[in-house]
From Swiss-Prot:
Record pathway: Cofactor biosynthesis; riboflavin biosynthesis; riboflavin from 2-hydroxy-3-oxobutyl phosphate and 5-amino-6-(D-ribitylamino)uracil: step 1/2
Binding-site residues, (2S)-2-hydroxy-3-oxobutyl phosphate: E85, T86, R127
Enzyme class: transferase
Pfam family, any one: DMRL_synthase
Organism, as annotated: Kosmotoga olearia (strain ATCC BAA-1733 / DSM 21960 / TBF 19.5.1)
Signal peptide extent: none
Name the record gives this protein: 6,7-dimethyl-8-ribityllumazine synthase
Entry's family note: Belongs to the DMRL synthase family.
Function of the molecule: Catalyzes the formation of 6,7-dimethyl-8-ribityllumazine by condensation of 5-amino-6-(D-ribitylamino)uracil with 3,4-dihydroxy-2-butanone 4-phosphate. This is the penultimate step in the biosynthesis of riboflavin.
GO biological process: riboflavin biosynthetic process
NCBIfam families: lumazine-synth, PRK00061.1-4
Residues the record lists as binding 5-amino-6-(D-ribitylamino)uracil: F22, A56, M57, E58, A80, V81, I82, F113
């Protein structure tokens, strides 16, 4: 029996981070967490591309464009969608989630999901590492694991 499991090893990996500028107080924390994880696991600065987009709705479009180029081993999608007083939150959260899921099925480049959905700014900041855990760090770890697992599967 053979068992395949991704590793948290970044040497030689090229990673793209697509990040929303909207809610930047939160997304900058997510970016810091993702960069911390990548650097701790040997991904060199010159192998990290950070692409800023206006808002969460633009993340899937640019993520797909980058994935289709197949120049990165994994892509990390980072953003923060915070509930307001209208139905807009539900639309944005659902469409961004569906968009990233579709890219993962369509294009052969793993995309990790580091998009926070929360009811308040305080909740979003907490999930971005202000109190504990950083979803950007976690998304980067998923990207490393999936990139390495993909390499193993390709070698079968």
């Amino acid at each position: 029996m053979r068992v395949f499991e991704g590793r948290y090893y970044g040497e030689g990996l090229k990673i793209a981070i697509v990040i929303s500028r909207f809610n930047s107080a939160v997304t900058k924390e997510l970016l810091d967490g993702a960069l911390d994880a990548l650097k701790r696991h040997e991904v060199k600065d010159e192998n990290i591309d950070v692409i800023w987009v206006p808002g969460a709705m633009e993340i899937p479009h640019i993520t797909r464009s980058i994935a289709l180029k197949k120049k990165h081993d994994a892509i990390i999608a980072l953003g923060a969608v915070i509930r307001g007083e209208t139905y807009h939150f539900d639309v944005v959260a659902n469409e961004v989630s569906k968009g990233i899921a579709a890219i993962n099925l369509e294009v052969d480049v793993p995309v990790s999901f580091g998009i926070i959905t929360s009811d308040t700014v305080e909740q979003a900041l907490n999930r971005a590492g202000i109190k504990s855990g950083n979803k950007g760090f976690e998304a980067a770890m998923v990207a490393l694991e999936m990139a390495n697992l993909k390499r193993q599967i390709e070698a079968i």
